[in-house]
UniProtKB/Swiss-Prot annotation:
Name of the protein in question: D-galactonate dehydratase family member PC1_4063
Residues that coordinate or bind D-arabinonate: 207, 257, 278, 307, 334
GO molecular function annotations of the record: magnesium ion binding
Organism of derivation: Pectobacterium carotovorum subsp. carotovorum (strain PC1)
The family this protein is said to belong to: Belongs to the mandelate racemase/muconate lactonizing enzyme family. GalD subfamily.
Keyword set includes ATP-binding: no
Length: 399
């Protein structure tokens, strides 16, 4: 096979709507351009610097065909590895290289991987409100759109406490009360089942807001309401507690969006302490490690539910679709509708049809970026108040 030489790499940060989105563009001497998602929205300029200052000089002039070799070189070239900045930067290039390979072969990615395992992947979206009546409206809107898996949150992560027993002069932050959150969320599950029965699957994201002993209590309490899964019931640093939760509750557990390093998931998968893995594909380094992770999890009965929040590009979401159509143990795909400006910047963005995401038949990833439109929306820093999470006494807690 003739070489396909990398001639240029560009990293573009754009903020068309609420989130800063990072896209890597790889150009070649064959006139074929690849696109990848490298979004780390809290630190986008750090990723851009990694691509522009370090990966571009390393890769320009090399053969884009050798993805496996280039991935390993990018990952180890700095010696220190497997962190959110380097992994997202590597992932953006990795996805773009796979995009180029698919375009060279004139095949969509899922065909390049080996073809499909299913006709479509079930999607779930988010219903949230401060009140049950508002939540019901959101649920019914999504149900009418065809969703049969709906993530339900009463209030934002950690709930919105009706009353907060706060200190005299509270430090600025996003406050929540764990006890109120548990009580309100258990009541939410009960109300949803009483109103809707089993018409749809309920998912819920704890988002690491509980201490380990509270997580055990919560899992036992919600099991009777048959959630499809409970997400991030613990922060990664406390995942050894999953064995205790497992021993006391059959509630399905999902985790992984914060994982960077294979060491963070290997024992959880081998010991079958989770049911679904929720890795963020760019956070673990791109398509190359995601394919290996999928095959590894299949050996232990762990299913795939890739993280797909609104703070990633439609390019990254399309990569998830290709992985899910191909990988046999894919279970479900998160999806949040794109705002108008995001669709303008990514005009090929894919959306569900009656609750399913279908294969993308265009060559490569099948979703690119309108560079002129993207440049109309420059990066804007924001302090990300929701990650400044505090308990009633002012203690900072995992967001």
């Amino acid at each position: 096979m003739l070489p396909t030489i990398i001639t240029d790499i560009e990293c573009l940060v754009t903020r068309p709507d609420r989130h800063n989105l990072v896209t890597v563009v790889v150009r070649t001497d064959k006139g074929i351009t690849g696109y990848g998602c490298a979004t780390f929205q809290q630190r986008p300029l750090a990723v851009k610097a990694m691509v522009d200052e370090y990966l571009k000089p390393l890769l320009v002039g090399r053969d884009a065909n050798h993805i496996e070799d280039l991935w390993h070189m990018m990952m180890v070239n700095a010696y220190w590895r497997n962190g959110p900045v380097i992994n997202n930067a590597v992932a953006g290039v990795d996805m773009a290289l796979w995009d180029i390979k698919g375009k060279l072969a004139d095949m969509p990615l899922y065909h390049l991987f080996g073809g499909k395992s299913r006709d479509a992947i079930a999607a779930y979206s988010h219903a949230a409100s401060d009140t049950l009546d508002g939540l019901y409206q959101d649920v019914e809107r999504l149900y009418t759109q065809g969703y049969r898996h709906i993530r339900c949150q009463l209030g934002f992560y950690g709930g919105n406490p009706d009353t907060l027993h706060s200190t005299r002069q509270p430090t600025e932050g996003a406050y929540y009360d764990q006890d109120q959150y548990m009580a309100n969320t258990i009541a939410m599950f009960r109300a949803l089942r009483e109103k809707y029965g089993d018409r749809f699957h309920i998912l819920h994201d704890v988002h690491e807001r509980l201490f380990p002993n509270q997580a055990v209590q919560f899992a036992k309490a919600v099991e009777v309401y048959r959630p499809y899964f409970i997400e991030d019931i613990l922060p990664p640093a406390q995942n050894e507690w999953l064995a205790q939760i497992r021993s006391q509750s059959a509630v399905p557990l999902a985790t992984g969006e914060l994982f960077n390093n294979p060491a963070e998931w290997q024992n959880l998968v081998i010991n079958r302490q989770i049911d679904f893995i929720r890795c963020h594909v760019s956070q673990i380094g791109g398509i190359t490690p995601a394919l290996k992770l999928g095959a590894f999890c299949q050996n232990f009965g762990v299913r795939l539910a890739w993280h797909c929040p609104p703070d990633m590009t439609p390019i990254g979401a399309a990569v998830n679709i290709h992985l899910n159509i191909h990988l046999h143990n894919a279970a479900i795909q998160e999806f949040v509708a794109y705002p108008e400006n995001t669709r303008k910047v990514f005009p090929q963005a894919v959306e569900p049809e009656n609750g399913y995401l279908y294969p993308i038949e265009r060559s490569g990833i099948g979703v690119g970026i309108d560079l002129d439109a993207a440049r109309q929306f420059p990066v804007v820093y924001r302090p990300h108040e929701w990650t400044q999470s505090r308990l009633p006494d002012g203690t900072m807690h995992t967001p």
